Each structure stands twice: as C-alpha cells, then as structure tokens.
Amino acid sequence: MKNIYLASLCVVLFAASSQMCVAAEPAKPTQVEIVMKASFKDRGQAKVDRLNQDETQRLCTQYPDKRPKAIASKIEAINMKLMKYPADGKLLGDWKEGEKIAQSGVGKQFSDDPTRPAGGNCYACHQLSKEEIAFGNIGPSLYHFGKLRGNTEAIQKYTFGKIYNAQAYAACTNMPRFGHNSILTEEQIKHVTALLLDPNSPVNK
C-alpha cells in the first residue's frame, strides 16, 4: 500500500512539475518577433527595423529586473566603447539652445518632419528649472545639477557622455541613448550639457 501511495505521489508531482515547466517556458524569440513585426509597418521615418535589438537591448530584455552584476558591467562596458566625444574637445554649447531642446518633444515619429531637428523632451522625465512646473518624475530631478556638482572638465565629460549614451553609466536605464541612436546631434548634446552645467542656466539658479 505504501509503495502504491509513493508511486501515485510521484506521478502527481511529475505532472505538476511538467505543467509548471510548460507554463514558465518563455515564448521563443522568433515567435515574439513574428507577432511584433506583423503588428507594425513602415510609416515615414518610423521603420520596422527599430524592432531589431542590439546586444544591449537583448541583454536588458533577457534580464529585465535583477540582472547579475557581471551582465550589468558587460552592458556598461559595451556602451562605453561606443562613446564618441567631440573632436574639437569642446563639450559645452549654448544653454539657451539647450532649454529649447529640453522643451521640445518633436522628432523621430512617423508624423514628424524628418528634416526638422529632434528635441530631447527632457522635461517629460526630469525637473530641470524652477520656472517650468510641468515635468515628469521617471528620472531624477536635475534642478541645480551643475550647482551641486561643479563645472570641471570631468563633470562636463560625464554629463555629455550620459546624454550621448546613458547605458555606459547605468545598465538598462530608461534614458534614451540620444547620441548613439542619432536622436540628437553632437551640437545639440553640447547645448543640453550647457543647460545642465552653465551657472547662468535656469537649472542652476
């Protein structure tokens, strides 16, 4: 009787574990890609190839929450190698132009004019100045960014780099890779860097 009970228990546990394995098995990437790509089509400058993931995106998809430290370090190292600083060595532009870029959410959508420069839409995620009360909180407040950190060459380089490719500093961050993905030009990134660091900028008042 005992043997029959144990055998029955084993069958039940095996069946349960099999169901759990099936339920936990993720959809094959190819199946997901087929469904996603079937749901989109090219419209203007918004192309379906935006669904193609690079190594950084694949790793962030594979480890969406608690990722191993080694994976996070790998992602940051990959993106640090992709960093491009201005050839002229100048990292600061005009903060007034930077404010315009931070306020603008135009760009890269199918309905946008591709000949117009894109904006950074920085206020959608960050507080920057005291005057602008419409801001998001997905990202940290950047108010007094330069006032708190100073305006050294190292800080300028970090700030420019963070805007150009934030994945080099924080693996799987929500912040877009503005320079790496050609959302903003080098000149625009200089302007936004100045917005954050110039002592005359409203960010630092």
Walk through the language-model features, giving the residues of each.
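Local sequence-structure signature of Cys/Sec-based thiol-disulfide redox active-site neighborhoods
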Residues: F110-N121
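Generic anion/oxyanion-binding catalytic loop in active/binding sites
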Residues: P86-A87, S111, F178-N181
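Post-cleavage N-terminal segment of exported redox proteins
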Residues: N3, F14, Q19-K108, K162, ...
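Positively charged n-region of N-terminal signal peptides that target proteins for export
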Residues: M1-A7
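Extracytoplasmic electron-transfer domains, predominantly the class I c-type cytochrome c fold
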Residues: T30-Q31, A38-K41, G93-E97, Y123-A124, ...
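Secretory-pathway/luminal and periplasmic proteins that interact with or process carbohydrate-rich
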Residues: K108-S111, E131-F135, P202
